[in-house]
Amino acid sequence: MHRPQNRTAALLAAFGCALAYLPAGRALAAVCAALPLSAAGQSFALHCAAAPLAEELVFQGAVQGLLRPLGPRAAVCVQAALFAVQHGGAAGIAYALVLGVLLGTIRQRTGRVWPGWVLHTVNNLLVFAAG
């Protein structure tokens, strides 16, 4: 009887946490834009340093942790979906969904956020270098 309530509370808390990231992400971008760097340097600071850490802490850390009552697979999949929708158009969402599942699985298996943060940072470095 308590399990559905725990699941509902977990989903509501996770969605709330993900929604709270929207203005926080914008604030993070504003901070990076104020750095005394070139536009390319500011973009690098945001996409290859600040954003991967913030996203890992929020999505694979807090959101996935809040979703534990749903079970490990559901927690990974739901956090990955929430992570993905924050990444723009259809191609960005599809790519971020796969990345979110991978990062969430790493978090689930290791119990830590930092291995996913390293992978996320390397991913963003490669995307930044290619773009």
List the model feature ranges, each with a label.
Residues 14-29, 40-131:
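Transmembrane helix-loop-helix hairpins at the membrane interface
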Residues 35-37:
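Membrane-interface interhelical linkers
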Residues 1-12, 66, 70:
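Membrane-helix interface linkers and caps
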